[in-house]
Amino acid sequence: MFALLTPDLGNTEIFQLIGGEIASLARVHNYSLVWGGSSQPRPDPDLSLQHAEELCHHFIDRRVSGVFFAPYELVSEKEEANQKMAETLREAGVPVVLLDRDVTPFPSRSDFDLVSLDNFAGGYLATEHLLKLGCRRVFFVARPRSAPTVDARIAGMHEALRRWRIEPTPNWVQIGDMADRKFTRNLTTAPRPDAFVCANDHTAALLLRVLQQAGLRVPQQVRVVGFDDVKFATLVSPPLTTIQQPCRELALTAFRAMLDRLADPTLPARHITIRPRLVIRDSCGAYAPRKEGRGG
């Protein structure tokens, strides 16, 4: 029996998809899968830190063979709690494979197996696309207390700017609540950016609405890139250019990592990354002819 501990299951589409793929793989290999505290893929949007810690002990009592764990984000005490839960499982002899994010801040690495998108490369790829379109004032937008994956995307964006010999605009990383009018007003007032890279598609969709309410046309006046390629990315107007999360490949890689860990518990911890893919839609427009040479 395996267990899946994903606090964002009820709120994040990618973890529903990854969890479903892991469940299918478990059945093929004659394992059952416990989703949180249930044997069914039932979202638990109220999975508090305390409840999650209780579930860890529940998994230990049930003698699960391993736990797939997507660490918490968006809570102030997430780092300590994530590390505590992972260590509790390991001390009980339960293998842990982390999904999507680490239990430590970027760029540090824990000594747990981790399977994720190459978020640094994703941030680079999204930014490079905008630079090829002629954008030069590019901002990054994220929610407070986001996962370490967001910091990796920011680092990738910074590297793209450096490679193109573009000095980042002051305050180019904007962390705030898209429901905060003061925060969103700062995003749309002069001198405003000519493009945004968003930490995820949800933030990008909210930003599209903010820009449209401010009378700004996307992509004619400002371009937007999201991250994840969730279903609604094609439903917003204009449809989002985004970095795709390859959920099936992430699930398959994580499941193989768990089987490897069970076969040889002495293996060194691994961070296995999946190459990102840019999905180009209307929120950025098409590629424009390049007028400037690229920096080396």
Predicted regions located by residue number:
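Bacterial carbohydrate/catabolite-sensing allosteric modules
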Residues: 2-4, 18-42, 54-68, 73-296
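Extracytoplasmic "Venus flytrap"
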Residues: 5-17
